[in-house]
């Protein structure tokens, strides 16, 4: 497996393959990174970073469009997630962070049952939030987990779990867990709204009485 050198962009967010992500670039070193990527038709990698530092597993990012350029050099742009990579070595020579990365090896496991469960839950979540399920989710059955994660707002830590899993089956199991939890939260929120509309009281069943 060959490694290649690319720019690294630590960020408090997680990009997954196929996801479109808007970025606002304001630091000089990352303005330089964007210029280099544009001039060299190169991609860079977004690595999730928090107080513990940047993770070694991330996702490559292709610049789709620079939507705005400001006079002071700041940029608004949109990137698309490419492939999951692992940083094997940090390198020097640029004003921004660079490293040698290699694609992460996938384990081949049958995930048909998990895919069906994840798709059904995704459709339920979309409908519960008043949205239309995106049919594109089923276009790449081998990466359905990423397609769903790109369309549902999950916490960064949970999206990082997806990047760190080595099989589509394992990722879909995470997706099923997250979507099921999300449906529970939506149901609780709906119940709270209903209670608020009735001053905290739940309507009695038919034929029942009421408090004096």
For each of these PLM feature ranges, what is it?
Residues 1-212:
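N-terminal low-complexity, acidic/polar interaction/targeting segments
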């Amino acid at each position: 497996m060959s490694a290649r050198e690319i720019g690294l962009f630590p960020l408090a967010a997680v990009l997954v393959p196929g996801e479109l992500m808007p970025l606002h670039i304001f630091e000089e070193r990352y303005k330089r990174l964007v210029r280099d990527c544009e001039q060299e038709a190169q991609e860079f990698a977004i690595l999730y970073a928090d107080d513990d530092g940047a993770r070694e597993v991330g996702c490559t990012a292709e610049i789709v469009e620079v939507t705005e350029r400001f006079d002071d050099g700041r940029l608004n742009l949109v990137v698309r997630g490419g492939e999951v990579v692992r940083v094997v070595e940090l390198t020097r020579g640029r004003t921004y962070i660079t490293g040698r990365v290699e694609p992460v090896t996938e384990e081949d496991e049958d995930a048909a049952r998990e895919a069906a469960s994840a798709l059904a839950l995704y459709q339920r979540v979309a409908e519960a939030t008043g949205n239309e399920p995106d049919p594109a989710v089923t276009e790449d059955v081998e990466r359905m987990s990423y397609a769903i994660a790109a369309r549902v707002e999950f916490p960064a830590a949970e999206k990082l779990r997806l990047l760190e899993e080595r099989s589509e089956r394992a990722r879909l199991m995470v997706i099923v867990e997250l979507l099921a939890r999300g449906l529970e939260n939506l149901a609780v929120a709906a119940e709270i709204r209903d209670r608020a509309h009735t001053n905290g009281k739940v309507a009695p069943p038919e034929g029942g009485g009421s408090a004096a």
